[in-house]
Amino acid sequence: MRFKIRGPLIQLRYKSTKAFYITTPIFYVNAAPHIGHLYSMLIADTRNKWEKLNPSKESFMLTGTDEHGLKIQSTAEKLGLEPKVLVDKVSQNFSKLAEQFDVNYDRFIRTTDNDHIELVRYFWNLMMEKGFIYTDTHSGWYSISDETFFPETQIEEVVKNGKAVKISSETKNEVVYQEETNYFFKLSMFQEQLIQFLKQNPEFIKPKHRYQFILKELEDTKLPDLSISRPSSRLKWSIEVPNDSTQKIYVWFDALLNYLTATKFPHGFEVQDSKFVTPENSIWPATHVIGKDIIRFHCIYWPIFLMAAGIELPKQVIVHSHWLCDGFKMSKSLGNLVDPMEISEYYGVDPVRFFLVENSNIDDDCKFSEELLQRSRDAVLGKYCNLISRIGGKNFSIEEAVKSFASGEFNNIREIIETYTINKDSVEGLLSSLNKLTTDLNDLYNQMDHYFTNFDYIRAIQCWWSVINQANQIFQSAEPWTYVKLINSPETPAELKEKYRILNNYFVYLCAETTRISSILIQPVMPQLSKKILDRLNVSGRTSEFTTLSADLQYGSGANSKSHKVPLEKIAPRDIK
């Protein structure tokens, strides 16, 4: 089968290593972006940036917009616009959202892109050739909002504005009964194969209760074949079915294929025994990040489409929950949508990023409020930024402290602490705290890597907070500023001044190392703020191999200059009444 590309090919730069490939859902352009869209982006972007933090790894992130379908057609008609004009405008809102929040995608895909449209046609013809598509009359309950049919078992009747209407029990959107001739995909042929795959790959869907939900549904309910086209008389804004102008391709059949489009499929994929062999240098298979409301499309339809084509299945599907505002899912009808662009103007981009990642509980719905966001921002300012403020003052020298370590002045630091620490009652506790912090700092990358790669972002950030809190506590307990006073006192003997200088430099050095290492490791979450602090420290090594104690001994020059501004300004709670 010939495959033509009318648009420019995306040049994938991965040659020698297998890149990690992560995707967001492509966002439907019938409305403006909200915090939920940003959340999906940030889950993927954080993991993408984390992978790239390790110079031995490569990563590719895909995001974009879903631009076909009846909802867009209807919205365009109401606005008096051509659908393409509408999607061009709204798609920019999503790319601007990514730009505003430092989401470093490798491709922003649009389902109106030429290479994607060609891929959809190719895939349709492939399924036709394999005998998995047929025509039939279809009747059932159709939701315009969800652009899908629902079985009778998922329909309930409610009263709206004094009138009885049918709705989907899953999405709560209104449905209407329709009968029409469509093309169908033989989902039912692959039900047992998908069940066996899921049983053999229990980590395919994360978290576990989402995996169990899909597996139970497949085991308990016979899959109906899927209607994958709509009459052109009703749906005009979609990709035309090859060789049949009376039908348009169902939006989800079109949309899901975007993940393959970005891989340049089928180019480079060899066919062996009716299956496509993934090239060694291909970014495929993908790790998909999706919201729980589209789990069936990604965990039932999509794997079956790939099975039918003979293509390797995705690596994993990460299903996140929703953000609640005042206990309710954010929605346009409730008027509780949060505009991420607006809140970032007040709180800043990185504090919003950090709040969403720090509270990224994919198992359950997350609670959003500006009070919680303010509290999170204050913690970043008062703990993380406070470290550089403490050691970056005029009484200390980070550069001298780093040089003290390099020259071996801390080789006998335990003995010096035991002998010359002013508060003798706190020596044992201080030594114990120092041992724990140095151990935790050396293991911080491994700990965070474990949690980030398992999409347990909350625990990754907890590990990060732990060393920040320990360093602040040690600085407060050790009181290095008292040694500065003693060093400057004419009454202090020269020998003691030297010991106090070493003690002072050691505590400054340990806090500087905590700041350096923690700043490198928080770059995937707070890229702007971490850059400011690393710039102030004059750190050049900013990748994972520099995230152990003393891995970098060439920083600190100018860090204590009076010219530095605070990395994050304190702000008052916003009056949102």
Swiss-Prot record:
GO cellular component: mitochondrial matrix
GO biological process terms held by the UniProt record: methionyl-tRNA aminoacylation
TM region(s), chain numbering: none
Keywords: Aminoacyl-tRNA synthetase, ATP-binding, Ligase, Mitochondrion, Nucleotide-binding, Protein biosynthesis
Extent of motif 'KMSKS' region: 329-333
Coiled-coil portions: none
EC numbers for this chain: 6.1.1.10
Pfam families (alphabetical): tRNA-synt_1g (PF09334)
Top-level taxon: Eukaryota
Compartments, record wording: Mitochondrion matrix
GO MF assignments: ATP binding; methionine-tRNA ligase activity
InterPro entries per UniProt: Met-tRNA_synth, Met-tRNA_synth_2, Methionyl/Leucyl_tRNA_Synth, MetRS_core, Rossmann-like_a/b/a_fold, tRNAsynth_Ia_anticodon-bd
Known catalytic reactions: tRNA(Met) + L-methionine + ATP = L-methionyl-tRNA(Met) + AMP + diphosphate
Binding site for ATP: K332
Family to which the UniProt record says this protein belongs: Belongs to the class-I aminoacyl-tRNA synthetase family.
Name of the featured protein: Methionine--tRNA ligase, mitochondrial
Organism whose genome encodes this protein: Candida albicans
